[in-house]
Amino acid sequence: MSEQPKKPTKKKVELDPRFVDVRHVWVCIESERGVVHPVSWELLGEGRKSVDALGGELYGVVICGPGERGKEICGEPVQHGADKAYLLQHEILRDYRNEPYTKALTDLVTATQPEILMLGATTLGRDLAGSVATTLGTGLVADCTELVIDTETRNLASTRPTFDGSLLCKPSSAQRHRPQMATVRPRMAMPEPDASRSGEIIEVPFSMIETDIITKVLEFIPDDTRDKPNLPFADIIVAGGRGLRNQENFQLVWDLAKVLGAEVGASRPIVQAGWAELDRQVGQSGKTVRPKLYIAAGISGAIQHRVGMDGADVIIAINTDPNAPIFDFAHYGIVGNAITVLPALTEAFKARLGQLKKAG
């Protein structure tokens, strides 16, 4: 008989004595000209869980320029679960540039030593997190979909995609140094704001001169995203998979989405076939979504797709295979050909919504 494989043991790493009593969790509040990215509030929900496990305090860190609602923004992390908020405000911090933002954040970390520092896995967050981790000489787990604290070791464990999204790995931070850092994908559960909560706002002085910075801001051009997919924050998504067979049939997804006022999503094979752009891909190597309604047409429900959408409030699956994995976690299932079911749904919704419009 072959021997049973031994269970992996937890790797114990002796903490640097400087960090033994460190317990606080920080969330970097991402904002642009006074507008906060929603991922910041989602991270505060994750941060609150970590703090409750560690027994420390949760801080929001706001970095911005003068006149960008700095103090007002600092009140919002408290309403979303933070105990306190740091405010770093300076003219040089008005528009994001890596050098001043890295200096602002690393100087603050060095002075106060948090246990964990979280940033959104956004364009800004990914750029800033790497340079901060390198400057501090600490570890960084990027593009996480889930975070968990090991209360025994105080290590931060995470779930993230690997091998181009075909597998999930669960790296754990076993290091002597702090903070433990992670960038987290948007569209995790967002805590409900509580206007009755209050907390301290700590203004932190920051000093840097323009000549110290290599990059220069020449002009600010707002990003017009009206015609771009915004899957992570859509309330309704209609997504199609290879069960639709060809690009012409994928148009049926667009037809239903138009009637419902929904965003269009796609599985990875659809994007690879060129039927939909990459920004519409849902799943481990695409977008993580949490809509109120997710309609999956011709999608089998493989793990790579599931991890990107199983947080939806309601999932309706359409598939010809009654044993398709998607039926294991869908709230409602239609065993049938999506090519015939989608037009029927489109007409039914169109008629019902028309009736409601006339009545109301």
Swiss-Prot record:
Database matches in SMART domains: ETF (SM00893)
A GO molecular-function annotation: flavin adenine dinucleotide binding
Name of one Pfam family that matches: ETF_alpha
Keyword annotations of the record: Electron transport, FAD, Flavoprotein, Nitrogen fixation, Transport
Organism domain of life: Bacteria
InterPro entries linked to this entry: DHS-like_NAD/FAD-binding_dom (IPR029035), ETF_a/b_N (IPR014730), ETF_a/FixB (IPR001308), ETF_alpha_N (IPR033947), ETF_asu_C (IPR014731), ETF_asu_C_CS (IPR018206), Rossmann-like_a/b/a_fold (IPR014729)
Keyword Electron transport part of the UniProt annotation: yes
Chain sites annotated for binding FAD: 293-321
Assembly: FixA and FixB form a heterodimer.
Family listed: Belongs to the ETF alpha-subunit/FixB family.
Protein known as: Protein FixB
